[in-house]
Design a protein with these regions (language model features):
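C-terminal helical/coil "lid" or tail adjacent to the Rossmann-like core of SAM-dependent
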Residues: 90-120
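A short glycine-rich, Lys/Arg-flanked "PGG" loop and its adjoining helix->strand segment in the class I
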Residues: 2-17
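Active-site rim elements
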Residues: 58-65, 122-124
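Conserved class I S-adenosyl-L-methionine
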Residues: 18-50
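Short alpha-helix
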Residues: 63-87
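Short, solvent-exposed loop/turn segments at secondary-structure junctions
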Residues: 25-26, 89-95, 140-141
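Core SAM-dependent methyltransferase catalytic element
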Residues: 124-141
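Peripheral/terminal regions associated with large enzymatic or DNA-binding modules
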Residues: 8-11, 28, 89-91, 128-131
Length: 141
């Protein structure tokens, strides 16, 4: 993450924003990512780094949650150029049904709006059900 944030800091002007849609840790996503996703998911990882064997190899699907939620104070200290403007947990079912893991969609296009409406009704419990989070970072320096 250090290389990514250093490069983003170099490229983004003050007031500029980064918009991220990242895997998120909830009771539901913990079950889904641990048992149905091919990449590692370790919310208890002690650090932000993990073993890798090369480009696009090695990962921790919980890393964004670790950085922006669990270790938020550390992020704010290490990257004072960035302010977390918004974290919005989302999509407990649409991501999965749209083929988010395998690219094979189980959700017909015509049903998207119905699923979105259904998920919006779940807002009071979204912190327990979301599989991803919409994250907005603003460069302040």
């Amino acid at each position: 993450p250090w290389s990514f944030f250093r490069e983003a800091t170099r490229c983004v002007v003050p007031g500029g924003k980064m918009f991220l849609m990242e895997p998120w840790v909830t009771a539901w996503s913990n079950l889904i990512y641990r048992h149905f996703h091919h990449e590692p998911f370790d919310p208890e990882a002690k650090d932000w780094e993990f073993e890798t064997t090369g480009p696009l190899a090695g990962a921790n699907q919980a890393l964004s949650w670790i950085i922006f939620s669990r270790d938020r104070e550390r992020f704010e200290k290490e990257f004072p150029e960035w302010r977390i403007e918004r974290i919005e947990p989302r999509m407990p079912f649409r991501y999965l049904l749209s083929g988010g893991f395998s690219f094979r969609s189980f959700m017909p296009g015509w049903s998207h709006e119905a699923w979105r409406t259904f998920e919006n009704c779940l807002q009071p419990v979204m912190n327990k059900l979301a599989t991803v989070a919409y994250i907005v970072l603003v460069k302040v320096k």
